[in-house]
Amino acid sequence: MTDLSAQKRLAADVLDVGKNRVWFNPERQGDIADAITREDVRELVDEGAIQAKDKKGNSRGRARERQKKRAYGHQKGAGSRKGKAGARQNSKEDWESRIRAQRTKLRELRDEGTLSSSQYRDLYDKAGGGEFDSVADLERYIDANHGDA
């Protein structure tokens, strides 16, 4: 067996890959052994006698499976958590989404005539002050206190 380490080094440089990624066609070993210049190696690369193997990457298959399960709420228990609650769910973003939903609901009720503009303003201010935990809580309050409206 011929020592092709010099050719492998040249080929790695020509192909701009590491030596381990250089592939020699076993049927063309004689031609490869005769290649002593970079130009010779370039010609063999063009002919396909020398090629660069594909780079190996990390499979995302397991990560995709885990993502799919988490979309259903699985694998999210206490044993899977690393950060604090505030790092996993930003409290400001949580507040923003809740208050936007409540204000949208209030606007709908005002526009369809269920609430007068003064009731709307009163409830809007209460919502902004954090009186209601959710849209459902807001609706319960409206039913209890503005049921006649």
From Swiss-Prot:
Q: Which organism is it from?
A: Haloarcula marismortui (strain ATCC 43049 / DSM 3752 / JCM 8966 / VKM B-1809) (Halobacterium marismortui)
Q: Which branch of life, at top level? A: Archaea
Q: Where is the composition biased (Basic residues)?
A: 58-85
Family indicated by similarity: Belongs to the eukaryotic ribosomal protein eL19 family.
Output the Gene Ontology cellular-component terms: cytosolic large ribosomal subunit
* Role of this protein: Binds to the 23S rRNA. Located at the polypeptide exit tunnel on the outside of the subunit.
According to the record's subunit comment, the protein's assembly and interactions are: Part of the 50S ribosomal subunit.
**Which gene codes for it?**
rpl19e
Regions of compositional bias (Basic and acidic residues) in chain numbering = 90-113
Name by which UniProt lists this protein? Large ribosomal subunit protein eL19
The segment annotated Disordered runs over 45-130
Q: Which Gene3D superfamilies match?
A: 1.10.1200.60, 1.10.1650.10, Single Heli x bin
Give the keywords, sorted: Ribonucleoprotein, Ribosomal protein, RNA-binding, rRNA-binding
- Molecular function GO labels: large ribosomal subunit rRNA binding; structural constituent of ribosome
What GO terms describe the biological role, i.e. biological process, of this protein? translation
